[in-house]
Design a protein with these regions (language model features):
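A membrane-topology feature that recognizes alpha-helical transmembrane segments
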Residues: 1-156
């Protein structure tokens, strides 16, 4: 079996399992626990590094690290600029998602990152139109980040 294929499968399976867990937790509690997000980031960094060693090609690792910094930085800026907007868990999850999406390529990164905001906006508009939310209603964003990441991986 090709080592790269095995590592990609490990990343996809792990991200999907952890993503579902985090989406459920965030939807219920508006929290993305450090005890899940941070070990996930560490393990994905190890897998990306193993991929770089196994393939003798560090380009995907470098792209993944840059993607983590860019998306994490963007979410951190949103957190600083909006008082009740993004939570700290969203910022840390953005590091994980940025790493995985950019590891796959910039197309996956752009599609996944933008899809999260589009999906979250549509959901918020539906809630507003149905009278189930107002401008002050807090909406968990983690599920939309994860859904966007899945779309990015599948479509990017």
């Amino acid at each position: 079996m090709d080592i790269r294929l095995a590592l990609v499968g490990l990343v996809h399976g792990g991200l999907l399992a952890v993503g579902i867990l985090l989406a459920v937790i965030d939807a219920r509690t508006h929290r993305l626990p450090n005890r899940i997000v941070l070990p996930t980031l560490f393990l994905l960094l190890l897998v990306a590094a193993a991929d770089a060693v196994a393939t003798a090609d560090a380009a995907a690792l470098g792209r993944g690290l840059l993607g983590a910094l860019v998306l994490g930085g963007f979410y951190a800026a949103l957190r600083l600029l909006s008082r009740a907007g993004m939570g700290g868990g969203d910022v840390k999850l953005a590091l994980v998602i940025g790493l995985v999406l950019a590891w796959h390529g910039w197309g996956a990164f752009l599609l996944g990152a933008s899809s999260a905001f589009a999906l979250g906006a549509v959901y918020a508009l539906v809630l507003l139109a149905a009278g189930r939310a107002d401008r002050r209603t807090r909406i968990a964003f983690g599920p939309w980040m994860i859904a966007g990441a899945v779309l990015g991986v599948l479509g990017g």
